[in-house]
From Swiss-Prot:
Uridylyltransferase (UTase) activity is inhibited by glutamine, while glutamine activates uridylyl-removing (UR) activity. It catalyses: [protein-PII]-L-tyrosine + UTP = [protein-PII]-uridylyl-L-tyrosine + diphosphate; [protein-PII]-uridylyl-L-tyrosine + H2O = [protein-PII]-L-tyrosine + UMP + H(+). It comes from Bordetella pertussis (strain Tohama I / ATCC BAA-589 / NCTC 13251). The gene is glnD. The keyword Magnesium applies. It comes from the Bacteria. One of its GO terms (molecular function) is [protein-PII] uridylyltransferase activity. This is Bifunctional uridylyltransferase/uridylyl-removing enzyme. Residues 437-559 form the HD domain. InterPro entries: ACT-like_dom_sf, ACT_dom, HD/PDEase_dom, HD_domain, NT_sf, PII_UdlTrfase/GS_AdlTrfase, Polymerase_NTP_transf_dom, UTase/UR. Residues 747-767 are annotated as: Disordered. Residues 751-767 have a biased composition (Basic residues). PANTHER family: BIFUNCTIONAL URIDYLYLTRANSFERASE/URIDYLYL-REMOVING ENZYME, BIFUNCTIONAL URIDYLYLTRANSFERASE_URIDYLYL-REMOVING ENZYME.
Length: 865
């Protein structure tokens, strides 16, 4: 084929597309742009076919969304080259030339070359192909062949089979996206509640003969006019969002990625407020639209199913005067039942809980609830019957989480608790929450509920034991619903939430003792986590102070349960067994303190030494064998380590009190997720730096560090480190660390230059780059000793602890203890430090400035020798 100059055509097409986008920028009407882009490409393709002819008798057809008449700025152009018979060599050359020309034109075609028989065969085996062909549209070539394809596709279309296949396909797609419209970075096309769900509904309706548009589907009785209007509005919102994503990135991008969210918010003219980022406000709009689509999707799919697979109403069995069981779904007896008696809006969910044979609600009931939700007003909320019903829902032995989720989806819970409405769809770009506030709240309720189930008792034995012994444990669900209810308002959300739950308790007639408990839990829901992870639990005063704040055993048990459920509901990455151990240790120490256990330092020291001695005897060590080692240890050492650690150290060091070489011993932690590392060597200024550098290079995350210097000048340092995710063989890792870390300590200078910090996973790096944590450092003297407490907050990154350790060394600051708290990509660490530099205002200021630089990633790099 002779060379064809496509540049004039390409330039005309590009100019026309640019003009269409410019018009969209003036008047952002999604359908107008999609139609215009489709028209431009249609015209270009028809001109192209004149320059690069189709094989004789062939057809060029648009399929998929392009066939439907929609073309996004950077979408593939889906084409079918339909041949009347298998291609000859000449036909193949013609097709090849046409496809090459499509690429030269800059269209990025998604093309297939098939005969009519190929199309029928492919459609039989693949519902996606069948759907794409059902939306085919003639562009050029033989109209007769196109009509034959249309006739063949319509002839083989079985509405019932098509419905079942599309429903399964949708369920699989939803599962791929974790069955939630509330993803951090949703795909506006494919995620639940997105554009694809809207398309599936229309495909199902079209196949069943109920129309091609929302208006026609409403006319067929599957939708009300207001529902059709809501869906049309949501569809336009998602179409515009997808267009904006393409224009913002200059590529086919359907994911609302972290780094795109601020730019999108700017395009929409959304500005940050004093308490909310613009990106959070943008995403709240997205989640509200996706929730609407998800809910109406359920109603419509059920409606279509009931039309396609009708069953007589005689199958229904009355539950009571208001509800019946219709094909294992809760059905309202009278369609106007909720309007006549709004109390049924809550009782419907209670009936669902009390009848385990019900698998859901009928489409009629869902629609009636949806359209009656406005009946939940101030008068409804004041009604004692409704208040009692709401508490009954929380007190049921089953179905609590399912029904609270259903109440949220149907907008009943946000209407009943207006303060809850504010947090629906509210994302927190704080680097550790991966759910919206409302979804996190329901996840906390779910976690509390799991503690009550015998089949999950092995997951958290202490939690299961405590909740079984807690009277009226449903009060925990109340506390969970309110613990983050004031997020995004500004101010202390714990204090504001406590006021809200106090009002709820008064309105709902809670016993004063119970009301005081839930208020305490909401006000102090962060307390136990902070003490366990940031304070020295070996200090009796820390335990006494915490016990004084908690007050009694009921509060302690309830706070422990809420804390575990809260952390577990934040993100799968935030919880680990080490945090679980810290919380359990704090619980048991506080329980003993509340029970009158005398926890002064002298008693703790004596008991700990006695228990450590007993453990060393069990290991075959004589009492006199350990004395040389113990004589080098001061009181601080025995107070900072438990008996098991002291015995472990003693067994390995009693015979080498002053070794010539570094001693490194490692064992798996008792909770089985990490390693306990002991380092014993002659003290040196860069020892902590070298050790942290090694851990960082090996992707070992330090959770706890205790640094001690013996009377004769040897460093005895203890670390808890977590192995990389997915690392199964901890014993092999322990052996490797023992060998490699000892080698590093023998030659720390060479080790420091060999250090190469690990990298964060790409998605975590993107998120922390877009939503960074403002670095903070607070240095304050410790009231009970000559040490200082350094609290830091920053975005997590590889090498952060190593960078801080270098600052300590450079300023002559000695580390005594480190408590590392990592919350997703946010760190909140506490260091107990000492050093003469901290006693002088000028050098103290220089130290704090260097710490802030290190937190921000601006620390000076060390040059290789």
């Amino acid at each position: 084929m002779p060379h064809v100059d496509l540049n004039p055509l390409k330039q005309r097409m590009q100019a026309a597309r640019a003009a269409a986008v410019a018009q969209f920028r003036q008047h952002p009407r999604p359908d107008m742009l999609l139609t215009e882009l489709r028209r431009i490409v249609d015209q270009a393709l028809r001109e192209l076919v004149k320059l690069c002819p189709l094989p004789a008798g062939a057809t060029l057809a648009a399929v998929g969304s392009y066939g439907r008449g929609e073309l996004y700025p950077h979408s593939d152009v889906d084409l079918l080259i339909l041949l009347p018979q298998p291609p000859s060599a000449a036909d193949a050359r013609a097709v090849e030339a046409l496809v090459a020309a499509l690429w030269d034109l800059g269209l990025e075609p998604g093309h297939s070359v098939r005969t009519l028989e190929d199309c029928e065969r492919e459609a039989r085996g693949d519902i996606t192909v069948e759907t794409a062909l059902l939306e085919s549209r003639w562009l050029a070539g033989s109209r007769t062949l196109m009509k034959r394809l249309d006739s063949a596709m319509q002839a083989r279309l079985d509405a019932a089979v098509f419905f079942q296949a599309k429903r399964v396909e949708m369920q699989q797609r939803h599962a791929h996206y974790q069955d939630t419209p509330y993803a951090l970075e949703p795909n506006c096309k494919e995620s639940p509640g997105g554009l694809r769900d809207l398309q599936v509904i229309l495909w199902m309706a079209r196949a069943a003969g109920f129309g091609h548009s929302w208006r026609e589907v409403a006319q067929a009785g599957l939708l009300t006019s207001s529902e059709a209007r809501d869906l049309r509005r949501a569809e336009q919102a998602f179409k515009r969002l997808r267009i904006e994503l393409h224009l913002l990135t200059g590529r086919r991008e359907d994911r609302v990625l972290f780094d795109l969210q601020p730019g999108l918010a700017a395009v929409y003219g959304i500005a940050s407020t004093a308490t909310r980022r613009a990106s959070e406000l943008l995403m709240q709009r997205y989640y509200w639209a996706a929730r609407l689509v998800t809910q109406l999707n359920v109603i419509l799919v059920q409606n279509i199913e009931e039309r396609l697979f009708p069953r007589p109403d005689s199958d229904a069995r009355l539950i009571d005067d208001d509800f019946r069981n219709l094909r294992e779904r809760l059905d309202i007896v009278r369609e106007d039942g909720f309007e006549r008696n709004p109390t049924l809006l809550l009782r419907a969910f209670l009936v669902m809980q009390q009848h385990p044979e019900l698998i859901g609600m009928s489409a009629r009931t869902l629609r009636a609830i949806w359209h009656s939700r406005h009946r939940i007003d101030a008068q409804f909320r004041r009604n004692p019957v409704n208040r009692k019903l709401f508490l009954q829902i929380l007190q049921q032995p089953r179905g609590i989480v399912h029904e609270l989720r259903r109440m949220t989806m149907l907008n009943i819970l946000p209407r009943y608790l207006p303060v809850f409405r504010r947090i629906v769809g509210q994302m927190q770009h704080d680097l550790f929450h991966v759910y919206t506030v409302d979804q996190h709240t329901l996840a906390v309720v779910r976690n509390l509920r799991r503690f009550t189930m015998p089949e999950h008792a092995q997951e958290y034995p202490l939690a299961s034991q405590l909740i079984a012994g807690l009277d009226r444990h449903w009060l925990l669900y109340v506390a969970a619903l309110f613990h983050d209810i004031a997020k995004g308002r500004g101010g202390d959300h714990s204090e504001l939430g406590a006021r809200e739950v106090r009002r709820f308790a008064q309105d709902h007639g809670l016993d004063p003792t119970d009301a005081e408990l839930v208020e305490f839990l909401v006000r102090h829901h962060l307390l136990m986590s902070a003490v366990a992870q940031k304070r020295d639990l070996s200090d009796p005063q820390v335990v006494r102070d915490f016990a004084a704040q908690v007050g009694d055993e009921r509060r302690l048990a309830a706070l422990y349960l809420l804390t575990v459920a809260d952390i577990r509901g934040t993100s799968p990455r935030v919880w680990n067994a080490w945090k679980g151990k810290l919380l359990e240790d704090l619980f048991r120490l506080t329980l003993a303190a509340l029970g009158g256990a005398h926890a002064d330092a002298h008693t703790v020291l004596t008991e700990r030494k006695d228990e450590a001695a007993r453990l060393t005897r069990l290991a075959g060590l004589r009492d006199d064998a350990r004395e040389a080692f113990w004589n080098q240890l001061d009181i601080a050492y025995f107070l900072r380590h438990d008996a098991s650690e002291i015995a472990w150290h003693t067994r390995h060091l009693y015979y080498q009190v002053a070794p010539d070489e570094p001693v490194v011993r490692v064992r798996p932690t008792e909770h089985g997720e990490g390693l306990q590392v002991m380092v014993y060597t002659r003290d040196a200024p860069d020892l902590f730096v070298t050790t942290c550098g090694y851990f960082d290079a090996k992707s070992l995350s330090v959770q706890d560090a205790r640094v001690h210097t013996t009377r004769h000048g040897w460093a005895l340092d203890s670390f808890i480190v977590l192995a990389p995710e997915g690392f199964a063989d901890l014993r092999a890792q322990a052996t490797l660390v023992e060998h490699e870390l000892a080698e590093r300590l023998r030659d720390p200078h060479a080790a420091r230059h060999a250090h190469a910090p690990r990298r964060l996973p790409h998605s975590h790096a993107r998120r922390s780059r877009v939503f960074p944590v403002m670095p903070q450092a607070e240095l304050s003297p410790d009231e009970r000793s000559q040490s200082w407490r350094l609290s830091v907050t920053a975005t997590d990154r590889p090498g952060l602890l190593y960078a801080l350790a270098r600052v300590f060394a450079e300023h002559g600051v000695d580390l005594i203890m480190a408590k590392i708290m990592t919350l997703g990509e946010r760190v909140e660490d506490v260091f107990i430090v000492s050093g003469s530099a901290l006693e002088r205002p000028r050098s103290q200021m220089q130290f704090e400035r260097a710490i802030l630089d290190a937190l921000a990633g601006d620390e000076p790099r060390q040059q290789a020798a």
